Amino acid sequence: AVVVVVAAELPEAAEAAEPGEPVEGPEAAVEVAEPALVPVAEPEAEPVPVVAVEQPVAVEAAPAAVVAEADVSVPQPPAEPAEQPVPEAEAEVVAEVVSEPESVVPEQAPEQAPAPEPEPGAMPEPGPVSEPEEIPAPARSAPAPGYDDAEREAVLRVMRERRDIRNGFRGDPIPHEVLLRVLEAAHTAPSVGHSQPWDFVVIRSAETRSTMHELAQRQRDAYAKTLPKGRAKQFKELKIEAILETPVNIVVTADPTRGGRHTLGRHTQPQMAPYSSALAVENLWLAARAEGLGVGWVSFFDEREMVRALGLPEHLEVVAYLCVGYVDEFPEEPELTQAGWSKRRPLSWVVHEETYGRRALPGEEPHDLLQETVANIRPLDAKALGEAWERQKRMTKPAGALGMLEIISAQLSGLSRVCPPPIPEPAAVAVFAGDHGVHAQGVTAWPQEVTGQMVANFLGGGAVCNAFAHQVGAEVCVIDVGVASELPATPGLLPRKVRPGTADFTTGPAMTREETLAAIDVGIETARDLVAAGNRALLTGEMGIANTTVSSALISVFTGVDPGEITGRGTGINDEMHARKVDVVRRALELHAPDPADPVGVLAAVGGLEHAAMVGLILGGASLRTPVVLDGVSAGAAALAARAIAPESLAACIAGHRSAEPGHVAALNKLGLRPLVDLDLRLGEGTGALLALPLVQSAARAMHEVATFDSAGVTEK
C-alpha cells in the first residue's frame, strides 16, 4: 500500500488571533467591521516645580545649577519653594468598539433555466465564456470562550500574589489531600513532545532536611566570598532557605531520557526536558499559593552533590528544591525587593514588536530605546532639594562646613525625590571596551591588541580598577561593545559587540548612525540591568587604545575649543606623536564638520563605541534617577554628548575627579561640574570615579546619621 501525504503549506510563524478578531483561512475571509479607532487624549506633561535657589544649587536639571562653575565654599540655602497648583485629573477616554457580527449568511443565487441540448451530430456554437462564480466563504463560528471576569481575575490574582518565601513559615502539617491537589496541578504542566520528564521527590524526614540544609549552607558561604563588599553586606542579612522550618520539601527533577531517543521536539533542543520540568514547578507554585501554601526555591546546591546525597538515579537532573509550608502572610512585594537586593523590571523593557529593539506594548506604536529613555528624564525634585538644605542647617555642624559634600547630598536628595537620600550602595562600575580605527594613524605607542588583553585582565581581577573596586566594595561589570578581536566567552563578560572597532575617522565616519544608536542602547540596557539588580550608583569606566584621541575630537566639537588646546598625551606619548595626534583630530573635524546640535551625528562621525555606550549609561541612569559618577576625559566627552541629547540628564551626574588630560578640564568647565578628587590621574578604567565613590556615599550617610541640634540637645549659635 502507498500512502500519499499532501501537506498544506502553512506560514512558519502565525500569530495567534485575539478573541473576536477574524482569522484568515485558506479561503477568502468574510470582511468584518474593524473596531472604530477613537483617539485617546495624551496626558499633560507633569509640571516641573521650580524654586529660586541661591548659589550653588538650583532646581533645574542641569548640574551647572547644582554645582556652580564658580568655586563656592559656603553654599546658602534656597528660598522656600512656591506651592504649585495641582492639575485637574483628565477625563478618561474610552474607545468605542464596533462589535463583530455573529454570522454572515451569503444570499442564494437565482436558479437558471437549463440550456437546450444540441441536435445530434451538430457542433456546438461558440458562445461567450462566463467567469467562474466566486463562492462566498462560509460563516465561521465564534472562538472558544474564555473565563468570566471573576474566574479570570482569580487566575491573574494567584499569579500576581505568588511569592518566593523564605521567612514566616509555620509548623502546621500539610493535609494529604491539599498536597495531592498541588502535585496534580504540577503534573498537568505542558511539556515538549508530551514527554512529562518530571518526578517529584517529597521529603519529610528531619534527618534528610538537615543534610540538605548543611549542603546549602556550604554553598552560601562559598558564594558570599565572591561578592564585593557592598553586596556582601546586603547578602549577609538575607535568608536564602527554609529547609528546616518547612514540614515538606519537594525535589523536582528532569529525566532527559524519558520518551526515548526520538522524543518530539528535542531533536535540536535537548534542553527541553529541564525546561518542561520548570513549567511543572510554576504550576506547583501557583496551586500552592491558591491553597495558602508558601513555596521557597533553594538554588544553593551543587547539583551532582545533591543527586548523590538524595540517592537519586545518576541520569536525573535536579531542576528545583522547594520548601513548602503554611505561612503567616504573603508579602505584597518579593522579599528580595523589600531587602533592596533587586527591583522588578517593567513590562515595557522586555516587549519587542516583530524584531528585537522595536519596543512597544500591545496597542502602542513601536519606539526606540533612546526615545523612551529621554522621555523619562526629569529635573531634580524641588521639594526634596529644599528639605535637604533645611536639614543641612539643622545638623550639628557649622553651616557649609562640609563644603562640596553638602552640595552632593542635596543633589542626591533632589534626584531620589526623598530626604535623606538613599545611600548609594551597592555600586557598580561599567567598563565599556572598544577599539578605534584611528589607531592606524599612529596616535599611540600601544598596540591595538592591548584592548582585548586588558579586558581579560579586568575579568581576572588584575587591573587597577579591580583593586580600587575591591577597596570601595563596588562591582566591576565589563562590556564588550566593540573590541576588534574576538573575545572568548568568560564569566563576567557581557558580549554586546556592535561592530569590531570603529573605522578610521580621518577617512570617513567612525561608524554609521544606526551603529551609534545601537551602542547607546547598550549603555542604556546596562544601566537598566545594573539598577534592576539593586545597584544604587553607577560609575563610568572604559577601555580602548587610542580613545583619548577620540575624546579630544568630541570635546572640541561640543566646547568649541581648538584641538591644540585640549588634546593631551594620553598614555604618555612623545612630542612628535603628540603633534601627529593634534593634526589627526584637526583633519577629522575638517573632514566631517560635525554639528554639535546633532549629538548622535557627532558620535557617528568622530566618536567611539565605548563613548556612545557611556552616553547611554548616563541617560539610562538619569531616567532611573540613579546617580552616575563620572570618571575622566572619556567620560567627560560622553557627558557632553549626553547633555546635548537630554540637558536634564546632568542632574544625575557627579564629577568623580579631574583628569590630567587638558580636554577633561574643558569638558568639566562646559558642563559646570566641580570634581571631587584632583590627583593628576590619567588612567581611565573608572579609577577616578571609584576613588570618589566613598565621598558620595559619605555625603548621603551624613544626612542619615548626623544628629540635628534639636535631637542632640546642642545649643545653636
Where are these regions (language model features)?
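A glycine-rich helix N-cap at a beta->alpha junction
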Residues: R220-P228, I240, G311-Q338, T512, ...
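C-terminal helix-cap and adjacent tail motif
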Residues: Y321-I377
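Small-aliphatic-rich amphipathic alpha-helix that forms the alpha element of a beta-alpha
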Residues: V182-H187, I250, R258-A309, G460-V476, ...
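N-terminal loops that bind phosphate or other acidic moieties
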Residues: L369-K717
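Glycine/small-residue-rich phosphate/adenosyl-binding loop
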Residues: Q196-S277
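Long, low-complexity intrinsically disordered regions
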Residues: A1-G146
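N-terminal targeting/leader regions
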Residues: E131-D172
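N-terminal amphipathic, basic-rich helices that act as targeting or association modules
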Residues: P43, V93, P101-S103, P118, ...
